[in-house]
């Protein structure tokens, strides 16, 4: 022992030392590599830092240059742009006049000289990098100074409208060097800059967002909203001002120009209202206390909310969020809203309020309109409100509150609106909620542009409803936020309710749907109950599919197209509900529909007191919903009745067929009875019957009935084609075996099966009849029948399940028919080639149906039913298959069934690939070209299912299995139940299966099962 140990140790030591040496060398290499990399990094770092500095400087220069150019353009061209807005033109001219034009021009020239001197060398670097892109955008935006450049908002129409509506403010600001003021005022006085942005919407947004973007990019620490907030805040003053290279005097001059161009009161009103309201949601309105506080708070708040939104690149957010306060939000809602309204008097608050005011004048009395007009003037005033102190905020708010109160009282006299507007705190809180929901509403604003006309009508009313309340306290954040959302809801609901209830419904709908309900609605989109009380049924049905933003569109669809829109969605909902109780869900929905109006009230209460307070709106919505619900219920009931009738017929047929099958089994000669294919197949049929029963249940689910009928006719087509194909595809061997097995089958089993399958698809019965026509032909026909039946059943099921997915629908459209019609027969017949013919007769028909599925989803349909069959059948009837067919192929089937879950993806691939292989064979056999050597292919098939990638047959099989998986997935579509319930249905039909199995001794069954399992 010692001797060997020593040598072992000796050998071990060298080995150990060698390993250690290698490790040491490797470590040394790593160290060298690390040191080399570090050295290179250090060597390159200075260059990298220099490049960063250059880029930063270039960006800075670009920002300054762009700012100066904007200031120059807005100061010089404003005369041209100002004329468009009649009111602003004089002010613009005055602002640009000797008083302001000279200082502005001087500042512009000075800044530009500095920029040119500093930037001209930098331009190359900038062009190479950020600067080039930025200058291009800024240049383009600058070229569209008025609103066309709405820049970040991308809502040029809004800003031009806003400018035209409140051009005096917007254009005046722009003309007064809006852009220069934009950054300058943003830096020194966010209020002024924000007012510019609010007013100009586009240009201020350009100058502010672009310059800020540049600025922010200059300062990577805070590139994003954080930077915006910080930069926009006091930091922005210190950072942006130095970056702009403008001294205090220049800043003062620029701000003075702004103040001169825009009345102080207007500036005060604008900033007080806009920013204050922004703060109300965000900073609790603390900003309005002092001009400086306002400047700082508004800066931080204004730039953070609005600018963040812009930089976030979420025009939706801008539109939806209180953040609209700035450019992005205000112009986004304004562009969507103001275009529809024809004037977003002030892109920001004015856009929200004046639009509300503008729409409201329709409903509001002259006094309210007068106040609205004041607000419209405030459009100018609001733009220029910024400079004003807190004292004017109170006056502006008072005016807003008065207008809002009058609007609320006069427009709808809805407590709802009065409730939100009366409490600025509430509005601020609600606005806060709004901003939080604004992200949710963002999609809505996006949709809002989709239906501007409806917005215009509805939006006007909605603003009347929504904005009046919003107007009062912090109308701008909440108002714009609600407005976009409300516009969506309004545009959707008004179409349904039109403007009849638009005043009531829109307000309530807007408050209800756009506020928390929408957010809740999105969160609960599946449930859709909290926020979908209005169109809850339709939305509930629809939301699972389309969710929040679509929910608005669907609201429009539901409201506008209650029957078509709601019905389909309702039908969708019932299918989901139908999964459990097919007919009950409709009633449940009907109940829910009936309850939905209460839901609306509840939701309204849940959402906001204003919405609850508008009982009229709730009542109108309830009535409308009730009508829609009733229609939907009727349609659903009809569908359910049809489905139930169809199911009853199928069940009746199945029962009769089962009886016939049992009788035939009993009456058949012992040899045939003992014949494994025949014996197993009838059992399979029985099992399939259970499966078909399950499938009928699936058919009962939702639209599957309609799709099933389609499938059946298709099956009928398949059947007729099947016979032809059967004759063509029938192989001599198949004909012999098929004659033996199938003929018996057709006589006793195929016809019953056909009837069974026919129960699933009335066609199979017909096919069952044709089978007698020719041994081979009907053998094939039974197969086809099975295929058609399985296909039909599967198709029905698949359409049920897949119908929702649209694949089965495509099949329903006819792809299923051609695929199933041609391939299934050939596939079936080839599969029929052996005793497998019986097995394939059932299994392959499914496969054939599934294989056609290769061309289309039909395999899913067939497979889905087949999968259910196979899981249930293969376990139960697979032994039968094993008897009827070599256990090995059958086992593959069952194994495929087991593997099915794995195969489905493969099957999808194979599905695509299989069709290609299939076509090469004769058309009849295309489906089963590989399968046509049913026995051999089946062997391969049995293997291929296991391999998932087996031969063509395997592919078909996999397809079939994926179909089963599809069945499992299909339940997801309509019958989340079908896959499970289908299997359960099969299990539920275990009695039937057992009764079929009873024909055989338990020992035989167990042996078959063992064989099947063993083969697996």
Curated annotation (Swiss-Prot):
Classification via InterPro entries: MAML1-3, MAML1_3_TAD1, MAML1_3_TAD2, MAML_N_sf, Mastermind-like_N
Residue ranges, annotated region (Disordered): 65-184, 263-487, 561-617, 658-681, 796-953
Compositionally skewed regions (Basic residues) per UniProt: 67-76
Magnesium found in the keyword field: no
Residues with Phosphoserine modification: 45, 120, 303, 314, 360, 1015
Keyword Transmembrane on entry: no
Segments of skewed composition (Basic and acidic residues): 93-115, 263-282
Biased composition, class Low complexity, residue ranges: 413-426, 801-810
Main location per the UniProt record: nucleus
Cellular component terms (Gene Ontology): MAML1-RBP-Jkappa- ICN1 complex; nuclear speck; nucleoplasm; nucleus
Region (Required for interaction with NOTCH proteins): 1-123
Localization per Swiss-Prot or TrEMBL: Nucleus speckle
Ranges annotated as biased composition (Polar residues): 116-129, 283-292, 322-353, 392-403, 427-439, 451-463, 577-595, 602-617, 834-885
Keywords for this protein: Acetylation, Activator, Notch signaling pathway, Nucleus, Phosphoprotein, Transcription, Transcription regulation
First and last residue of the signal peptide: none
GO terms classed as biological process: atrioventricular node cell development; atrioventricular node development; myoblast differentiation; Notch signaling pathway; positive regulation of myotube differentiation; positive regulation of transcription by RNA polymerase II; positive regulation of transcription of Notch receptor target; protein phosphorylation
Any one GO molecular-function label of the UniProt entry: peptide antigen binding
Residues with PTM N6-acetyllysine: 822
Organs and tissues of expression: Widely expressed with highest levels in heart, pancreas, peripheral blood leukocytes and spleen.
Similarity field: Belongs to the mastermind family.
Function: Acts as a transcriptional coactivator for NOTCH proteins. Has been shown to amplify NOTCH-induced transcription of HES1. Enhances phosphorylation and proteolytic turnover of the NOTCH intracellular domain in the nucleus through interaction with CDK8. Binds to CREBBP/CBP which promotes nucleosome acetylation at NOTCH enhancers and activates transcription. Induces phosphorylation and localization of CREBBP to nuclear foci. Plays a role in hematopoietic development by regulating NOTCH-mediated lymphoid cell fate decisions.
Assembly behavior: Interacts (via N-terminus) with NOTCH1, NOTCH2, NOTCH3 and NOTCH4 (via ankyrin repeat region). Interacts (via N-terminus) with p53 (via DNA-binding region). Forms a DNA-binding complex with Notch proteins and RBPSUH/RBP-J kappa/CBF1. Also binds CREBBP/CBP and CDK8. Forms a complex with PRAG1, NOTCH1 and MAML1, in a MAML1-dependent manner.
This protein's domain notes: The C-terminal region is required for transcriptional activation.
Listed name of the protein: Mastermind-like protein 1
Organism: Homo sapiens (Human)
């Amino acid at each position: 022992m010692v001797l060997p140990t020593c040598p072992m140790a000796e050998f071990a030591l060298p080995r150990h030392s060698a390993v250690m040496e290698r490790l040491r060398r490797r470590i040394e290499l790593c160290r060298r590599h690390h040191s080399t990399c570090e050295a290179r990094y250090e060597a390159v770092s200075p260059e990298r830092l220099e490049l960063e500095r250059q880029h930063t400087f270039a960006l800075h220069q670009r920002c300054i240059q762009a700012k100066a150019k904007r200031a120059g353009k807005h100061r010089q061209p404003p005369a041209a742009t100002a004329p468009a807005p009649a009111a602003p033109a004089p002010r613009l001219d005055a602002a640009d006049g000797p008083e302001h034009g000279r200082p502005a021009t001087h500042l512009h020239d000075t800044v530009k000289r500095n920029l040119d001197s500093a930037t001209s060398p930098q331009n190359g670097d900038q062009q190479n990098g950020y600067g080039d892109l930025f200058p291009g955008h800024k240049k383009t935006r600058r070229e569209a100074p008025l609103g066309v450049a709405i820049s970040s908002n991308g809502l040029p129409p809004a800003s031009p409208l806003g400018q035209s509506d409140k051009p005096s403010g917007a254009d005046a600001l722009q003309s007064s060097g809006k852009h220069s003021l934009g950054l300058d005022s943003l830096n020194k006085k966010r209020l002024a800059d924000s007012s510019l942005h609010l007013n100009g919407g586009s240009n201020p947004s350009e100058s502010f967002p672009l310059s800020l973007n540049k600025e922010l990019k200059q300062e990577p620490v805070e590139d994003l909203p954080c930077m915006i907030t910080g930069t926009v805040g006091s930091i922005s003053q210190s950072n942006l001002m130095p970056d702009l290279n403008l001294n205090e005097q220049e800043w003062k001059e620029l701000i003075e120009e702004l103040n001169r161009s825009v009345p102080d009161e207007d500036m005060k009103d604008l900033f007080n209202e806009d920013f204050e309201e922004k703060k109300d949601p965000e900073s609790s309105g603390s900003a309005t206390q002092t001009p400086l506080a306002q400047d700082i708070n508004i800066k931080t708040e204004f730039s953070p909310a609005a600018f963040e939104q812009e930089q976030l690149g979420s025009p939706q957010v801008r539109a939806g969020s209180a953040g609209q306060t700035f450019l992005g939000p205000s112009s986004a809602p304004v562009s969507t809203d103001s275009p529809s309204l024809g004037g977003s008097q002030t892109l920001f608050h004015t856009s929200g309020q004046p639009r509300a005011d503008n729409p409201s004048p329709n409903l509001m009395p002259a006094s309210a309109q007068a106040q609205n007009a004041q607000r419209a003037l405030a459009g100018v005033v609001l733009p220029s409100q910024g400079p004003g102190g807190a004292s004017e905020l109170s006056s502006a708010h008072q005016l807003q509150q008065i207008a809002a109160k009058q609007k609320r009282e006069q427009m709808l006299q809805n407590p709802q609106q009065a409730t939100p507007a009366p409490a600025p705190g509430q509005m601020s809180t609600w606005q806060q909620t709004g901003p939080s929901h604004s992200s949710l509403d963002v999609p809505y604003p996006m949709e809002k542009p989709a239906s501007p006309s409806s917005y215009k009508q509805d939006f006007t009313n909605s603003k009347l409803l929504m904005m009046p309340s919003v107007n009062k306290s912090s109308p701008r954040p909440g108002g714009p936020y609600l407005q976009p959302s409300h516009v969506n809801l309004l545009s959707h609901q008004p179409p349904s309710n039109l403007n009849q209830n638009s005043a009531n419904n829109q307000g309530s709908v807007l408050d209800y749907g756009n506020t928390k309900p929408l957010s809740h609605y999105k969160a609960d989109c599946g449930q859709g109950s909290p926020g979908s009380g209005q169109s809850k049924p339709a939305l509930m049905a629809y939301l699972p599919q389309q969710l929040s933003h679509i929910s608005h569109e669907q609201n429009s669809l539901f409201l506008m197209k209650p029957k078509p829109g709601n019905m389909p969605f309702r039908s969708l909902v019932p299918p989901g509900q139908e999964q459990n109780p097919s007919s009950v869900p409709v009633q449940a929905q009907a109940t829910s529909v009936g309850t939905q109006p209460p839901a609306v009230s509840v939701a309204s209460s849940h959402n906001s007191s204003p919405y609850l307070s508008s009982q009229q709106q709730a009542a109108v919505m309830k009535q409308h919903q009730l009508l829609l619900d009733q229609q939907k219920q009727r349609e659903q009931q009809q569908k359910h009745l049809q489905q139930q009738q169809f199911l009853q017929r199928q069940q009746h047929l199945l029962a009769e067929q089962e009886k016939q099958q049992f009788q035939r089994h009993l009456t058949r000669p012992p040899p045939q009875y003992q014949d494994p294919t025949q014996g197993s197949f009838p059992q399979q049929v029985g099992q399939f019957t259970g499966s078909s029963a399950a499938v009928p249940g699936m058919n009962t689910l939702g639209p599957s009935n309609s799709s099933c009928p389609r499938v059946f006719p298709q099956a009928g087509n398949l059947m007729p084609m099947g016979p032809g194909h059967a004759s063509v595809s029938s192989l001599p061997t198949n004909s012999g075996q098929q004659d033996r097995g199938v003929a018996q089958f057709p006589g006793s089993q195929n016809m019953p099966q056909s009837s069974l399958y026919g129960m699933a698809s009335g066609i199979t019965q017909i096919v069952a009849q044709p089978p007698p026509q020719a041994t081979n032909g009907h053998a094939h026909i039974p197969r086809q029948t099975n295929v058609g039946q399985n296909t039909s059943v599967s198709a029905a099921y698949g359409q049920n399940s897949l119908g929702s997915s649209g694949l089965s629908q495509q099949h329903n459209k006819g792809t299923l028919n051609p695929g199933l019609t041609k391939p299934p027969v050939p596939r079936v017949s080839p599969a029929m080639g052996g005793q497998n013919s019986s097995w394939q007769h059932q299994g392959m028909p499914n496969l054939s149906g599934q294989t056609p599925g290769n061309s289309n989803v039909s395999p899913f349909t067939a497979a889905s039913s087949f999968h259910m069959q196979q899981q249930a059948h293969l376990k139960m009837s697979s032994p039968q298959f094993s008897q009827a067919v070599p256990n090995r192929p059958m086992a593959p089937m069952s194994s495929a069934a087991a593997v099915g879950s794995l195969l489905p993806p493969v099957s999808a691939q194979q599905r695509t690939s299989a069709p290609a292989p299939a076509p090469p064979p004769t058309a009849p056999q295309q489906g089963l070209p590989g399968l046509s050597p049913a026995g051999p292919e089946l062997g391969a098939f049995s293997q291929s299912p296991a391999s998932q990638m087996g031969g063509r047959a395997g592919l078909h099989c996999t397809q079939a299995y994926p179909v089963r998986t599809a069945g499992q997935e299909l339940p997801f579509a309509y019958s989340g139940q079908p896959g499970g319930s289908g299997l359960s249905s099969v299990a539920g039909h275990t009695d039937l299966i057992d009764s079929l199995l009873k024909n055989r001794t338990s020992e035989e069954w167990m042996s078959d099962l063992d064989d099947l399992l063993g083969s697996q």
